Swiss-Prot record:
A Pfam family reported for this protein in Swiss-Prot or TrEMBL: UvrC_RNaseH
Record's protein name: UvrABC system protein C
Keyword hit for Mitochondrion: no
Entry keyword set: Cytoplasm, DNA damage, DNA excision, DNA repair, Excision nuclease, SOS response
Native source species: Salmonella enteritidis PT4 (strain P125109)
Annotated gene: uvrC
GO MF entries: DNA binding; excinuclease ABC activity
Record text on subunit structure and interactions: Interacts with UvrB in an incision complex.
GO cellular component, one term: cytoplasm
HAMAP family the UniProt entry points to: UvrC (MF_00203)
Gene Ontology biological-process entries: nucleotide-excision repair; SOS response
Amino acid sequence: MSEIFDAKAFLKTVTSQPGVYRMYDAGGTVIYVGKAKDLKKRLSSYFRSNLASRKTEALVAQIQHIDVTVTHTETEALLLEHNYIKLYQPRYNVLLRDDKSYPFIFLSGDTHPRLAMHRGAKHAKGEYFGPFPNGYAVRETLALLQKIFPIRQCENSVYRNRSRPCLQYQIGRCLGPCVAGLVSEEEYAQQVEYVRLFLSGKDDQVLTQLIARMEKASQDLAFEEAARIRDQIQAVRRVTEKQFVSNAGDDLDVIGVAFDAGMACVHVLFIRQGKVLGSRSYFPKVPGGTELGEVVETFVGQFYLQGSQMRTLPGEILLDFNLSDKTLLADSLSELAGRRIHVQTKPRGDRARYLKLARTNAATALITKLSQQSTITQRLTALAAVLKLPAIKRMECFDISHTMGEQTVASCVVFDANGPLRAEYRRYNIAGITPGDDYAAMNQVLRRRYGKAIEESKIPDVILIDGGKGQLAQAKAVFAELDVPWDKHRPLLLGVAKGADRKAGLEILFFEPEGEGFSLPPDSPALHVIQHIRDESHDHAIGGHRKKRAKVKNTSTLETIEGVGPKRRQMLLKYMGGLQGLRNASVEEIAKVPGISQGLAEKIFWSLKH
C-alpha cells in the first residue's frame, strides 16, 4: 500500500451506491478502472491485509489517488466502466487491442438501390447486412452477388451522370438502371428483393420465386427468359450448397477461449441466419497475474459494449465458461439493442458443436501466435546483443518517399516486444524544403516527432534511420539540439544503408556517420528484424506518398482552368466519379453538374482534351 495514499480517510468518504472508480499512480496516470454494485464494499477489498493476487498487490502499491463516479444503476456503471477503459487504456486492465469496426454489406435506399461495403456509423438510408469478419469476405460476397443478381455497385456520382451503359452492363454484371429503357423498374426491384432475401439467409424463398418465374416464362414460350432464369437458379444453388448451415434462423455469436504462457486468445464465430459468416481471433493485452475468468469477463464486456454502435448484436451469445456478470451483461446489451439479447453458457446438443469449433480455433490461433511471439523475441534478443543493449522494448524506424522531389512523405513505424504496433504508425507531410532534399526531410520529421514531451513508455530504445551515413548525420544533429523534458540520450540511433546491388541481406549498419559500417550475416535473426521494420517503414511511406500524389493528380489539371475554383472542382469530381470520369464525359454531361454553365463546360472539356 502506498504511504502517500490514506486509504482509511478515503474509504470514509465513499458511498455504498453503484458506480465506477479510477485509480491513479504518482504520475497522475490512470492505472486501473473498475465498477461496483457497492462502491464502498468493493474499494475496501483492495486494502485488506490478505489480498487475492500478486497483480492486486502490485496495483495497490502504486495507488496515489482514486476518483469515484456514482451511477444510478449497475448497468450504467458497466457501460461507463468500458468507456473509461477505452479512453484511458489502463495498464492493469485487460485490454481489447483490436477495435476495428466490422464491415457490412450496404443496400442503399435509392430509387435504384446499389450494393457496397460499409464500415462505421450507419447514418445512410438503407439496409445493412452483416457483420462480416473482414473486408475480404465482403468483397468476395459482393463479387458473387454481382454475378447472380446484377444490380449496380457504382457510386451515385457515376450513376447519375451516365448517358450510356458501362462495361459492367456489357458483361452482364449490371442491369444498367443508369440508362433509361435498359431494364424495367419491376425487374430491377425484383432483383433487389432477391438480394435482400439472399443476404438475409432466405435462399429457399429466392429459389422458389425463381423457379415459379422460370416455369411461367416457359409456359409463355419466352424460352430465352426461361434460360436466363435457369442459369440464375443454378448459380444460387451452387452457392448455397457450399455453405455450412446450422439450425434454421440461428443468429448468434459463439465465443471460445484459450490461455497459455500469459497470453490469451478469444475466438469469435459469427453465425447469421443459420450460416457461418466467418470468424476472428483476438489477443487481448493481459497484465501479469491475471486469471482467465477476468480475461473472459473483461473481453466480452469491451467487445460488445465499447463497439456497440458499430456492431450488429446477435440474438444470442454462446460462451463455454461461466460469467459472474452474465445477467448484468445480458440486461445491458438488451437495453442497447432495444430487444432481448440472451447470454448462454455451456449449451448442449448441436450448439455445443459450435463451442467446440470456437475452442479449437482459439487454441490453434494461440499456438501460432506464441510461435510468432517466440520468433520476434528471439530476433529482438539477438539485435539487443549486437547493439550491446540490455533489452529492446520499443523501436522506431523512419523512411522518406517522393517522386522527383514532389509530394514528399515521411513515415514512422513502431515495433514493441510483440512486433509491429500498427496503431502507432504515423505519416508526416513534408513542406518548406528544397524538392528532393532527403536530408532536410529527415531533419524535419525527427524534430516534429521528438521535439516535444514523450511518455516514458513511448521513448524508443532504438531509432532506425533508413538511408545510411547522411541521414544518420541529420538524426545526430537533431538530437544534439533537442531541448526536451525526457532523456534524449536513451535512444540508440542506427543508420541502415542498402549494400551492393541493393539486395536484401547485404545491408550496412552505422552507429556513427563517419567511418566504416558493419554487416550482419544474411541468416542473422538480428538482421531479419531490422529488415522487417525497415520494409514496414518503406511500405508505409510509399503508401502515403501514393495517396498524396493521387490527390494532387486529381486536382492539378482542374486548378489551371479559369473559372473552376475549389467548390466547383470538388463538385465536378464528385459528380463525375473522379478525374478519369470527367475526362471521358461529354460537354452536355459536364454541363449537368450544378454550378457549371454550358460555356464553362466547353472550356473544361477542351482543357482536359488538350
